């Protein structure tokens, strides 16, 4: 055990024996402080420059020599480096002449922009926690716990964006990938270091969730939002604007309505989309916050496209609908990609919207249907269709009371439902599928590990006959079998056979206590943010 790790463990023990203010914020001896700075900069190529910059940030902050000032300085350093990387990307774009490379580079600019935003949010949240507001991470208060969850969520997302950027160069000569990779490596490593330190310094003891079914609304959801979700007739919802393909609304296209919606709105903006088939690709940017799309029902209001990897696009860019503005809600809508299995990756819905909710929606495609890319997401009473890895990404996503349907793949292809992309054990990401139905029409596997720490759990879920006895599939060879976290609890149906499941070190047939840590109440602290929106959700384990 290295000196910096030992130091962090000592401080972690202190957190639980005395107040945060006296353990984490007290002045540290300069030698110990230097060890913390070194840990913040470990594995950074320009190590000495990183150390120097963090020292400068600490001095400028005026918060003294303590672990928190190092964390805040490291986040600022990551933010500054991400901004610098984003500014350099257009230069690389000017060098490329191939269309797929151009798309990949454009993706990188947007994704690094996501990281800049998420790191900025993280700095603001750290200021709330430790900037003199009197909030103590160890006092059990709502504000402290919620802010801590926000930090881990945003840092987890900021760590993943750079990977998605580089994945976009699949199918290219990758020479421009190398130019971009150098700028991104330092950002990713800095965020990884901060997550590691933050997790060790602020780990909280296990608290089991209560086993109950409640109607609850998160703090970020207003009473107006709740009442909107409970109304079954869109015509009485008093939407801000109406889209109708037949011309009987203010707009004929959804894109027109979104473009006219206010930017950075703190209030819910409701767009009612009347029944019809809308052939358009929608990209709801970060600035479009608190947008709500309401349709006339699954199969009635349909947004459809056919973008796909074989057209020279990245997976990220194939989405029929992409949402990244915070607080997005969709109700009674079908999201569809019709590219078919022969065209490989073809996303119907990509979600980078923090605190987003999807209620009574259908997401239909083949390979890579639902891209739960990042941040906190909730799906209730939804239907998901696909063939390969059709629920994938590195968001913190819960699917509850949903129906998952498999479709016919290409010959020799194997049907896999999930491919969760958790890269670090410190990321608070993963997929939880609870109280749902896996309705397999083909031999089907529950998931496979896309990244080293892939995490997916099925609980209280019905599995039909064609779910294979072994349950799960390798990505390749023994990759991630020791480090992934896959679990099942209290599943039923002919596709659930405990005796035949894989024997990987990372696979678990969970007992009740372990399962409780993956409930909405514990795994993602759902009582604070999951958008129940007036719809009953199970906070603990179902009966």
From Swiss-Prot:
S-S pairs: 382-402
Positions of the catalytic residues: 368 (proton donor), 389 (nucleophile)
Superkingdom: Eukaryota
GO MF, any single term: pectinesterase activity
SMART domains the UniProt entry points to: PMEI (SM00856)
Enzyme Commission code: 3.1.1.11
GO cellular component terms listed in the entry, alphabetical order: extracellular region
Top EC class of this enzyme: hydrolase
GO BP annotations, alphabetical order: cell wall modification; pectin catabolic process
Site residues by UniProt (Transition state stabilizer): 367
Annotated metabolic or biological route of this protein: Glycan metabolism; pectin degradation; 2-dehydro-3-deoxy-D-gluconate from pectin: step 1/5
UniProt-annotated location(s): Secreted, Cell wall
Pfam families to which the protein is assigned, alphabetical: Pectinesterase, PMEI
Catalytic activity: [(1->4)-alpha-D-galacturonosyl methyl ester](n) + n H2O = [(1->4)-alpha-D-galacturonosyl](n) + n methanol + n H(+)
Residues noted as binding substrate in the record, renumbered to the chain: 315, 345, 448, 450
InterPro entries membership: Invertase/methylesterase_inhib (IPR035513), Pectin_lyas_fold (IPR012334), Pectin_lyase_fold/virulence (IPR011050), Pectinesterase_Asp_AS (IPR033131), Pectinesterase_cat (IPR000070), Pectinesterase_inhib_dom (IPR006501), Pectinesterase_Tyr_AS (IPR018040)
Positions of region (Pectinesterase inhibitor 22): 38-197
Residues annotated as glycosylated: 211, 263
PANTHER family to which the protein is assigned, alphabetical: PECTINESTERASE
Note: The PMEI region may act as an autoinhibitory domain and prevent untimely PME activity during transport.
Membership in a protein family: In the N-terminal section; belongs to the PMEI family.
Annotated protein name in UniProt: Putative pectinesterase/pectinesterase inhibitor 22
Organism: Arabidopsis thaliana (Mouse-ear cress)
